[in-house]
Amino acid sequence: LSRSWLLVNAATPDVFAPALASEADSVIFDLEAAVPEEHKDAARQHVVDALSGGMTAWVRISATSTDHWQRDLEALTGLDGVRGVVLAETEEPEQVTFTAMRLRAGTPVIALLESALGIENATAVAKAPGTFRLAFGVNDFRKDVGVGEDPLAMAYARSRMVIASRVGGLPGAIDGPPGNTDGEDAVVDSSAVTASMGMTGRLVLNRDQVDWVNRAMSPSEDELAWARDLLEKHAQGAAVGDGSYLPRVLRAQKIADLADSYGLWNA
């Protein structure tokens, strides 16, 4: 389970190795928004060269409504270095399924929801064959809907994605990135909002922000101590005090599972 998903411009292959050497849990080579139209073909070839030459990464591919979608899929199919794809501008469940069908069997597809229609169809997309996780295209969503960046204004969309992920049996949703120039305090604060909404990962545009996102998205030392104490007592047969006991045990187990997936539980 990845906390940080670092997006890097596929048109500048010199950033691939530094990104993969960073603290990012996952790296995404971006063939879509970051790449100007005139550089699409060259960027696609850079990705093919990297993923057939020993590197492994996710790839953000173009929307199904574009000519580049088919070209991206043709280039990526069969490459051993493809960890999965992020499908831009997902709005319908069939878009994910059609994408998955054109890739090597078992290749995971992250559906990037970037519009009102995408959020409205979040549950159907989450349940679609081929969907691995949901991710939030925050900036494009704000442009489409006309809402501000205040957490309260974005709470409904984030909640819809979290609930849809749960209904679809998926891992927690991935939130959009902090501002590219945000400093540590701003990144930590906004990532705390992400975590409080029930999301378990976040896109990142700036490599310098990765460590801050990882820390903010991880269970705190206090949470880990509380979970260890409760789970130890539960394992020793602690008496059920009231109706809140079992929900607290489940919460503690969720913290333990998250921490274990991040390599923190036995650290």
Q: What is the predicted role of each segment?
A:
Residues L1-A267:
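Expand to "…catalyze enediolate/carbanion chemistry for C-C bond making/breaking, isomerization
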